[in-house]
A protein has these predicted regions:
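N-terminal domain-start signal
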Residues: 1-210
């Protein structure tokens, strides 16, 4: 009952998702121009036609538009949620903040420019704004790790024993391990839904392993 209103509103948002026929049309598109044209007919249009993207390549415009759209969806779901349920929902959404951190650390490892990657960061509001700004601005992996000091992510990497010695994989694995262990613990707090949550997590973990 407590989540009834929120659940109804979130279900209504499903109408904005692309239908099977739209996804199939995109999959069969002959080029990026056709993909862009098809997406302009969907709920992604407002993000695609943003003036700030005009000088980007079509591929970058699509990726950035999808990032903005998804960030907005996360914020809306959180806003619709009952206050006493938001901490749990934020914990689930933490997956996307960890993906942000992994993306940024990997970009430092590959020596990609800040300009190339910063528009692909999802806005979750979990990592303090200052820490995220420092992570984005970091010149290399070590500076990026320093930006995370004082956060659970730095502690997770430290506890795992992972170190950066030219190989980024141990750091990324430590962050994934932190999230999945946390989710398994959280699932135990909801006995009636534990099996469903653990099944979902198992599917995600299996997909990650594949």
């Amino acid at each position: 009952v407590k989540l009834g209103y929120s659940n109804a509103r979130v279900k209504a948002m499903k109408a904005l998702l692309m239908q099977k026929r739209e996804i199939e049309a995109i999959a069969e598109a002959k080029n990026i121009e056709e993909v862009f044209s098809l997406l302009e007919k969907t709920s992604y249009r407002p993000d695609l036609i943003s003036g700030t993207l005009a000088e980007k390549t079509l591929a970058d415009q699509i990726e950035i538009a999808c990032t903005k759209n998804f960030s907005r969806t996360l914020r809306k779901i959180l806003k619709l949620s009952p206050p006493d349920a938001r901490a749990s929902i934020m914990s689930v959404f933490e997956k996307y903040e960890i993906e942000n951190i992994k993306l940024l650390l990997t970009s430092k490892h590959l020596k990609q420019s800040k300009e190339k990657i910063q528009n692909l960061v999802l806005e979750t509001g979990i990592l303090p704004r200052g820490a995220m700004s420092r992570l984005i601005a970091a010149k290399d992996v070590m500076e990026g790790l320093a930006a995370l000091e004082g956060t659970p992510y730095a502690s997770a990497i430290e506890k795992s024993g992972a170190k950066y010695e030219g190989n980024i994989t141990p750091l990324l694995a430590a962050l994934d391990d932190y999230y999945y262990k946390k989710m398994q613990q959280m699932a135990k707090q909801f006995p009636g839904e534990e099996r469903a949550m653990l099944k979902m997590l198992k599917s995600v973990i299996d997909a990650k392993n594949i």
